[in-house]
């Protein structure tokens, strides 16, 4: 065997006649036999030929000029031997000699341990069951593919929103896949009334709202700079509104936007050439008009109630919204025969809390067509979801849903101050001329003058005005009026007198209007320039 290799390539003349690939194949064969034979054959090759092979096998652009011939041969043998060992181990684990290509249709992979299945998506790598056909966390439940850079606005998700009946499976799908699926209800030219504004989950069949997805398309279109994405988002919004009877005004606005773009390009936006799609939106003649229609559609959507599986048949009016309470007025339509007693059920919760276990329920009974009721003990500055169901016996007649945001405590305090100011002004008008007339507005102007002249500090001004409008008694207000009248020509003396007399009063704690927590922010809001 040694004599054969010696004859074939054992001298410099023989090796120089061989191509680079032939020399490389011979080196691989020799490394599988023995190190001695490997070195014996390569000893007669030139250093440049061996260095060339070493650079190719090590995949490093190093000249190796500082090594002797024996050192170069030894290093080449070690590298080639390791490669042979690694290839042999791979063959034992994976019998197939062909390299498997990445398959996005079924994104599963055996890795990180024998027999364990993991998602091929590097951003997910979810552990999967052996019988799984796709990754439920990151892949589409229709086409089984995933996106490398997932854009949530291009996906529909089966969520656990309690406005619709049924349990959510939590799966998601591409928006375009849903358009092509008959099970989703989005393929129909005219959707039925029970899923208008909604879509059906292809996996479990649960009804979900598509309004949030519609809003995302319009918002992105309004902010987009590239023509291609701009037109694509408006096209998706147009498809989501196809055949709707519930959102006619919104559909008309989007339709106008589509027509403007069609007139601009001369072709439907679904057939937009790639050359046109690379342009900038602000260079379009119709850009301003299209964005105006998108904004009008968004404004209309914000004013509409959430979609429901049952059409509303009650007239609900929100009479007042405070920090901790909301008052409703319900009027039943005349077309419904309510009987002797009207039965309502109201379910409400914070928008941030989607778990049904935290939903609060109240049963309401009324013998008249009008019912007024107040929901108490709410959290200030919080969005609440309300659902009011009307019954005839045990049968549900209608469902109405809406979101209400409670006011902040400061908003209530400001309203109380404005009411106090109005009362003071009315009382001042009724007083006789020549009598002392000193209302809240005069107090505000006076204290600001003292602050601007450096007689009082900003902190004292805030606390004093808050105390004066919310906590001061009539007697204390009368004392302030006397001081103002007495020291009206000496601002420095007036400031000292107010500080000495009322420093303790303004820091004394009193029960506040409405029983809320103490706040000194009212005067701040009223006095900001």
UniProtKB/Swiss-Prot annotation:
GO cellular component, one term: nucleus
Boundaries of every Fibronectin type-III domain copy: 312-411
Domain of life: Eukaryota
Location in the cell: Nucleus
This protein's UniProt keywords: Metal-binding, Nucleus, Transcription, Transcription regulation, Zinc, Zinc-finger
One of the GO BP terms on file: response to cold
GO molecular function, one term: zinc ion binding
InterPro entries, alphabetized: FN3_dom (IPR003961), FN3_sf (IPR036116), Ig-like_fold (IPR013783), Oberon-like_PHD (IPR032881), VIN3-like (IPR044514), VIN3-like_C (IPR056990)
Induction: By cold, especially after vernalization and transfer to warm temperatures (e.g. 40 days at 4 degrees Celsius followed by 14 days at 22 degrees Celsius).
PHD-type Zn finger ranges: 137-207
Region (VIN3-Interacting Domain (VID)): 421-529
Record flagged with keyword Metal-binding: yes
Motif (Nuclear localization signal): 97-104, 214-221
Entries under PROSITE patterns matching the protein: FN3
Summary of the function given for this chain in its UniProt record: Involved in both the vernalization and photoperiod pathways by regulating gene expression.
Database matches in PANTHER family: VIN3-LIKE PROTEIN 2-RELATED, VIN3-LIKE PROTEIN 3
Oligomeric and partner information: Interacts with VIN3.
UniProt name for this protein: VIN3-like protein 3
Naturally occurring in which organism (per UniProt): Arabidopsis thaliana (Mouse-ear cress)
